[in-house]
Amino acid sequence: MLFPKRLIVWGVLLILSLSQFVLYLPATTCTNSKGLRLCAPQFTITVIGGSSTANEFIASVREFLRLISYLTIDMGWSNEFTDPSVYEDENLVDTFQPDKVFELNYFGFCKRSNKSKVYCTSNENYGMDVLEVLVRDVGIQLGNISTTRSNETKKFGDSLVLTYRLALTSIRDFLKHDKHTGNALSKALIGSPDPNVKGVSPTKNYLKGVNLAFILMMFNGMVFYFAVLEIIVGFLSICVVSAFGGALSVGKRHRLFPMLLKSSSSILVVIATLTILCNIVYLIALKTLEPEEVTDVGSDNAAVHTTGWELLKVNVGSGFIMGLARYAIQWVLLVLAFLAANHYKAKPKKSDKYTEDTSNSPSPDLMEK
């Protein structure tokens, strides 16, 4: 009767460990456009605009992308430049159009338009950084426009993301050093603020936006490696549970495997907690970039802006919900792992206990003294 009972305990632990690991599969989607385009995103974002600074920025970027698209065609990079239809808006770079939805995941993202996926691609080790996703999409579309290099669209995206990273770091350093010189260069490039207009100066707004972009870049790199580490530990947890079951089939009491079972389950929950917390913090950060409509009685201005860069619409994806379900299973696994490990761990032998008691008891000579 003892063996079936041990087998049932091990079976429950194995099912839980396998279930939590299977729920990591959605985290690896949104990476491939070939075949069935599966995507269970952590978040979905759309560029919609909100504050005056964000609207001006989006309008400028759209016009710049339109110019780049025309240059890509006119410079002979496309072999279809004689066809007038290639100049139509739907054939140009449309990254910042409000009908485009980006589905973000740890290892890649998908671009969706009118409920149909345009493409999915891996995002290397850059994680879910929204701005890098948008930059990569611009590079991929430029690669698609230049049809003579249509097989190198991923290289276009990679090179543009690398350029963005270098440019962001340089601009951040430039604005920080220029701040100590009275923003002389910034005023020359951006323009001096109107003294009659109250509010934050354009220079401070742009510095705030650059700092926010830099923080998002660094933070998402950390979240990416947390996610990779969590998947590795989740797989190791299956191996430990399997080894624990093999040990139970040989004998009832053990020392090493119960300790490994408790350690692996504890480490898994700790790393999963860090990943979940990082995702929640990132969601809150993205929500600060989302316009908030507030209806005030007697107020003409209904929009309240917190950062000056409200330009995104953010929603939680199915992958985030599955991550919460996986996290709950990992907690159940942790509790059962501790109960099973404590129940089946080897108890100290009587000889060992007698030796310990003897070493701790005072000698007769000391008692006489």
Swiss-Prot record:
GO terms for biological process: ascospore-type prospore membrane formation; spore membrane bending pathway. It comes from the Eukaryota. It is a multi-pass membrane protein. Residues 28-220, 287-319 are lumenal. Belongs to the SMA2 family. Involved in spore and ascus formation. Required for the efficient assembly of the precursors of the prospore membrane to a continuous prospore membrane. This is Spore membrane assembly protein 2. It comes from Saccharomyces cerevisiae (strain ATCC 204508 / S288c). The gene is SMA2.
